[in-house]
Amino acid sequence: RQRQMCIRDRKYTVEELTELLKNKEKPIYVAVNESDVCVGYAFCQLQKQPFSNNMVQFKTLFIDDLCVDQQARGQHIGESLFEHVKKEARKMHCYEVTLNVWAGNTPAEKFYEKMGMRTKERQMEYIL
């Protein structure tokens, strides 16, 4: 029950999460405190890039969602999760770790830059 706090109000149902946990191409890393309560997680996806046949294929570990419980912030849990993701990506022989950040989410941008990430590409939209 305590670990469900990690997924409450999130984008996955318990059933979807159960299926994700079975998928080796979508690893989930969880940080727990000394009471074994979930205080953060990183949902990832192993991707093969590029999707074109005219380039050399490589593997990417994409961070779909990295989140730390608001009351546990400032304890370096996000840094620990990110470092763990990098370590696991190396074990999987990935070329890179990637993620998306919403424009204007300055705290997240600063956090990922502090962790050594750099902007790779910029996607724009025109809403109809």
Language-model-detected regions and their locations in the chain:
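Short, small-residue-biased leader/transition segments that mark boundaries at the very start
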Residues: Q2-I7
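Acetyl-CoA-dependent GNAT
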Residues: R8-F58, D64, F82, I127
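Short coil/turn motifs at secondary-structure junctions
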Residues: Q47-Q49, Q71, G104-T106
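Conserved acetyl-CoA binding element of GNAT-fold acetyltransferases
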Residues: V56-Q70, N100, R122-E125
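Conserved acetyl-CoA-binding loop-helix of GNAT-fold acetyltransferases
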Residues: V68, G74-K87, E113-M115
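Conserved GNAT acetyl-CoA-binding A-motif
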Residues: A89-N100
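Conserved acetyl-CoA-binding loop of GNAT-fold acetyltransferases
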Residues: C94, E113-R122
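Conserved beta-strand-loop-alpha-helix junction that forms the acyl-donor binding cleft
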Residues: T98-A108, E125-L128
